[in-house]
Regions:
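Conserved phosphate-binding elements of NTP-dependent enzyme cores
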Residues: 1-200
């Protein structure tokens, strides 16, 4: 591991090194691409500004599945319930209360241009960018664009990180650096097994 035949270039220009491995982007089943790159904060703010949200007193936290408020109380925002099996592996079943949508029915009644928060999380990156472009949500697009740029346009915004491959996890990590923007300092990215799942 770590062997190479030659390393050349102007090393004096490199100010820091980023090691990108294939470890999952989050340990929680609630972790997903859109939360990792911080775009979900802007999406939640968008829904909190809707007229129905203001009437009902909903804040951005009501559109989070990590805290109490708007998430389904039965599955705690997981969208599924684990059933313990005595002699077999546990079985994960869709939550009967929310139908796997992770939020309370009342929260799902809040829509932005006809789409509720579950509809947004079910969109692919490509579809979400097109949707937000149609409605001029530049700030959200700027954060989603790097995911498309690294070839993850097919992934759903709310797809659990546990279902992503090692190569996909690497791409999301790379996208998160791109979201932060270009700086004057030069960085060297070192990828763990870059030929595994990570090619453009």
């Amino acid at each position: 591991a770590g062997q190479f035949s030659e390393l050349s270039g102007s090393f004096s220009h490199i100010k820091h090194i980023e090691y990108v491995d294939q470890n999952p982007i989050g340990r929680s089943s609630r972790s997903n691409p859109v939360t990792y790159i911080k775009a979900y904060d802007d999406i939640r703010d968008l829904y909190a500004k809707e007229k129905l949200s203001k009437v009902r007193g909903y804040q951005a936290k009501h559109f989070s599945f990590n805290v109490d408020g708007g998430r389904c109380e039965t599955c705690k925002g997981e969208g599924s319930i684990n059933v313990e099996m005595v002699f077999m592996a546990d079985v994960s079943l869709p939550c009967d209360t929310c139908g796997g949508k992770r939020f309370k029915k009342e929260v799902l009644e809040v829509t932005f241009e006809g789409k509720n928060i579950d509809d947004i999380l079910s969109m692919t990156i490509d579809d979400a960018i097109a949707f937000f472009q149609n409605h001029k949500q530049t700030k959200i697009i700027q954060k989603l664009q790097p995911l498309q740029d690294v070839g993850l346009g097919y992934v759903q915004l709310g797809q659990s990180s546990s279902t992503l491959s090692g190569g996909e996890a690497q791409r999301i990590k790379l996208a998160s650096f791109l979201v932060k923007g270009v700086t004057k300092e030069k960085a060297l990215f070192v990828f763990d097994e870059p030929t595994t799942g990570l090619h453009f």
